[in-house]
Amino acid sequence: MLLKYQNNASGNAPSFVRFFRVPGMNHSHGGIATDQFDALKALVNWVEYGQAPDRIIAGARGEGNASDQVNTELPSDWSANRTRPLCPYPLIARYNGQGDSELAEHFSCK
């Protein structure tokens, strides 16, 4: 429903609504995904400080990660410190072609 609204709304929809998909994540967490992120912080920054999120940084929950939960579905070759940007729909994260592919800073929302 949100996607239908966003696709059909006037051009100012991104000024008050953003939808961030998490590739590979199950319903609320887990799956082969970078499923650890703070959407509430992004929302607070938008509502209270006028800083609309253009990306949300997500991490993988794996051995060695600061999280107390371990996502057992992650591939063994993923770094526990893997990060990715979550991009507002319809944009998706694309690797820039240079730098460590485990770090969000080397990806852009396109």
Predicted features by range, described:
Residues 1-110:
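C-terminal His-loop and adjacent cap/lid subdomain of alpha/beta-hydrolase
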